[in-house]
Amino acid sequence: NYGTYVGKMDILSSLSTLSFDKRRSKFFTDELLILLKLIDTNQIDYKTLYGSWAGAFGFFQFMPSTMKNYAIDFDKNSYIDLKNNNDAYASASNYLNQIGWNSANPCFFRISYNNWQVVDLPLVPVIPIVIGLI
């Protein structure tokens, strides 16, 4: 059911509320400010900003900082719309390209469990990725 449900929360309200949470106030405040800047510069349409409770938006659930750094207005309609296939896929492709993903590397591994037992495997990422505020 890809794309049929991308969240129903107003992400402006979500980020505003979460910016007051002491545990991650700086992160969510920064995300809120980035979102407001994207709206102010007419890069995104504020009327379409419904997503997750944490402020993620679109088919690929981009946070505002990810939108700012990687989202593309592929269909050239003057707005980045991550609920539009053209913009969403172009943005996801740009994101993967910019973080160094190589199409020659596998994106998943086939695994199996004997008798449904949890197995502790020493898995390491194929591509080391630094996770943090983008």
Indicate residue ranges for each PLM-predicted region.
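Catalytic glycan-binding domains that act on GlcNAc-containing polysaccharides
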Residues: 1-134
